[in-house]
C-alpha cells in the first residue's frame, strides 16, 4: 500500500524576531579568491538562497484539481495582486523605474554603456533609505533599531547593475532575490497564504515586474552583460525567468507531490516554439520563459540558433518542460552559484550568513571548482559593487544541467567553438555531468 504521508517540503525559515532576533550586521565581502568558492558552497547563505528559489519554483508548477479535470495553471496575466506586502513592493519597483525619466540617456558617442546610468543609480541610492521607510516595508525594517534596514538595503541596491562597469548580470538578479529572501525571513510576506499562493505572487507580481524594470534599464542605458560567456552563455543578463518559466509549464502535480522531473502541462507550447517569433510574442504575455526569449528577440537580430545557441539546444529537449526545469536548476548552480566571477561580490551578514551549514557536504573538486581564477581582478570601489554575487544553497548537483540536444542548421561545426555533440543516447538527459555538492534540498526525488 502506498504511503499517503506528504513528503517534507522545505521552505525558507521565518525568524522569530521577538524571542530570538538576529544580530543584524552590515554585510561584508568574504569571497576573495577562487578557493573561497568551495567554502561558500558549504555556507548557510548558499543553503538559504537555494531553499528559497526551490520554494518559489515549486509554487509555479501547475496543480491538479479535484473539482475539475483541468489543472490550475499560473500565468503572468493572472488576477492582480491583492496582498498588501506584494502591492508595496510593486509600488517600490514603479518608483525605482520612474527615476529613468530624471536621468535621460546621454546623446554623446560611447562604446560601452551610457554614462547617464550613473546619474540614475545616484538618484536611486540617494532615495533608497526613504523608499525603505515607507508603509509596510518601513514597519518591517524597524526591527533591530534600524540595523535590519541597513543590512537589507545592500541587497536591493545591488539588484540593479554596476555603476562602475555599466553592466548588469545574474549576480545583480540574485541580489534582488536575496532582498526578497531577507524580507521573507523578517516576516514581511506573512500577510499572504504561505505554501503556494504568496510564493506565486512573489514570482509573478514582483520578480517579473523587477525584470521589466531591469530590461528598461538595459535598453535605456545599453548596459553590458556582466560576466557574460558571450553567445555561449544561457542569457546575457538573467537566469530566473528560465527557471520559473519552465516551472509554469511542467506536468501538473498534487499538493503533496514533489516537482516532476519530466513532462509538460496539457496545452503548453513546445520547447522548440522558442524559435517561432509568432508563438513567442503570444506566450511572452503569460510565461516568464517566453517573456525572456521575447526580450532577446527585441534586442538581437539574426537566426536564433546563432545568437542564442544554448537556448536553441535546450529547445530540442524531448522530455518536456519538467526535464528542462530540472536541468535549469542544475545549470544555475553550476554556471552562477559555483563561479567565482559571479559570487565574488556576494555580501554576507546575519540573514545570509557565511557560517557553515551543519548539514553541508564537502564540495567535490570538479572542473567547475578547479578552474577558478586565483583572485579577482581589481575594480573601482564604491557604490554599486555589491552585486555580481549570485547566491545559492545546496542546489542540485552542479553541472551543465542541460546538455546540447539540438543540432543547428547545416553549416560549419568544427573548431574551438564548435558545439558539443548531441547526446548519443537519444534521451535528452539533463543529468548533471559535474558534481560540486549534494545538499539535502537538492536530492532527486
Swiss-Prot record:
CDD domains: PTPA. Keywords: Cytoplasm, Isomerase, Nucleus, Rotamase. Residues 422-436 have a biased composition (Polar residues). Signal peptide: none annotated. Its EC number is 5.2.1.8. One of its GO terms (cellular component) is protein phosphatase type 2A complex. Belongs to the PTPA-type PPIase family. PPIases accelerate the folding of proteins. It catalyzes the cis-trans isomerization of proline imidic peptide bonds in oligopeptides. Acts as a regulatory subunit for PP2A-like phosphatases modulating their activity or substrate specificity, probably by inducing a conformational change in the catalytic subunit, a direct target of the PPIase. Can reactivate inactive phosphatase PP2A-phosphatase methylesterase complexes (PP2Ai) in presence of ATP and Mg(2+) by dissociating the inactive form from the complex. This is Serine/threonine-protein phosphatase 2A activator 1. It comes from Gibberella zeae (strain ATCC MYA-4620 / CBS 123657 / FGSC 9075 / NRRL 31084 / PH-1) (Wheat head blight fungus). The gene is RRD1.
Amino acid at each position: 500500500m502506498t504511503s499517503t504521508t506528504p513528503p517534507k517540503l522545505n521552505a525558507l525559515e521565518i525568524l522569530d524576531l521577538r524571542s530570538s532576533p538576529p544580530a543584524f550586521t552590515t554585510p561584508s565581502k568574504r569571497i576573495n579568491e577562487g578557493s573561497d568558492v568551495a567554502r561558500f558552497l558549504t555556507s548557510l547563505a548558499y543553503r538559504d538562497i537555494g531553499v528559497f528559489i526551490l520554494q518559489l519554483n515549486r509554487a509555479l508548477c501547475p496543480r491538479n484539481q479535484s473539482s475539475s479535470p483541468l489543472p490550475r495553471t499560473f500565468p503572468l496575466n493572472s488576477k492582480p495582486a491583492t496582498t498588501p506586502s506584494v502591492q508595496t513592493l510593486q509600488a517600490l519597483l514603479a518608483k525605482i523605474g520612474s527615476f529613468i525619466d530624471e536621468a535621460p540617456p546621454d546623446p554623446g558617442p560611447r562604446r560601452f554603456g551610457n554614462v547617464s546610468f550613473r546619474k540614475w543609480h545616484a538618484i536611486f541610492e540617494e532615495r533608497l533609505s526613504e523608499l525603505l521607510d515607507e508603509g509596510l516595508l518601513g514597519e518591517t525594517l524597524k526591527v533591530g533599531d534600524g540595523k535590519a534596514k541597513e543590512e537589507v538595503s545592500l541587497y536591493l541596491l545591488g539588484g540593479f547593475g554596476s555603476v562602475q562597469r555599466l553592466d548588469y548580470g545574474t549576480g545583480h538578479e540574485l541580489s534582488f532575490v536575496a532582498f526578497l529572501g531577507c524580507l521573507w525571513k523578517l516576516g514581511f510576506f506573512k500577510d499572504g497564504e504561505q505554501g503556494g499562493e504568496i510564493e506565486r505572487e512573489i514570482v509573478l507580481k514582483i520578480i517579473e515586474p523587477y525584470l521589466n524594470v531591469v530590461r528598461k534599464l538595459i535598453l535605456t542605458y545599453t548596459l553590458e552583460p556582466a560576466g557574460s560567456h558571450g553567445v555561449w552563455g544561457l542569457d546575457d543578463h538573467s537566469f530566473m525567468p528560465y527557471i520559473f518559466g519552465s516551472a509554469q509549464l511542467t506536468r501538473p502535480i498534487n499538493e503533496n507531490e514533489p516537482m516532476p522531473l519530466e513532462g509538460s502541462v496539457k496545452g503548453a507550447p513546445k520547447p522548440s516554439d522558442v524559435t517561432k517569433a509568432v508563438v513567442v510574442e503570444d506566450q511572452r504575455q503569460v510565461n516568464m520563459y517566453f517573456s525572456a526569449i521575447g526580450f532577446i528577440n527585441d534586442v538581437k537580430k539574426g537566426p536564433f540558433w546563432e545568437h542564442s545557441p544554448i537556448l536553441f539546444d535546450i529547445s530540442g529537449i524531448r522530455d518536456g518542460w519538467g526535464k528542462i526545469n530540472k536541468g535549469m536548476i542544475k545549470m544555475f548552480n553550476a554556471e552562477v552559484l559555483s563561479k567565482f566571477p559571479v559570487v565574488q561580490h556576494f555580501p554576507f551578514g546575519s540573514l545570509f550568513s557565511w557560517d557553515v551549514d551543519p548539514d553541508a557536504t564537502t564540495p567535490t573538486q570538479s572542473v567547475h571548482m578547479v578552474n577558478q581564477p586565483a583572485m579577482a581582478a581589481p575594480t573601482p570601489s564604491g557604490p554599486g559593487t555589491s552585486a555580481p554575487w549570485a547566491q545559492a544553497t545546496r542546489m542540485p548537483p552542479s553541472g551543465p544541467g542541460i546538455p546540447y540536444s539540438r543540432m543547428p542548421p547545416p553549416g560549419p561545426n568544427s573548431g574551438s567553438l564548435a558545439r558539443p555533440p548531441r547526446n548519443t543516447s537519444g534521451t535528452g538527459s539533463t543529468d548533471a555531468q559535474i558534481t560540486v555538492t549534494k545538499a539535502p534540498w537538492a536530492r532527486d526525488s
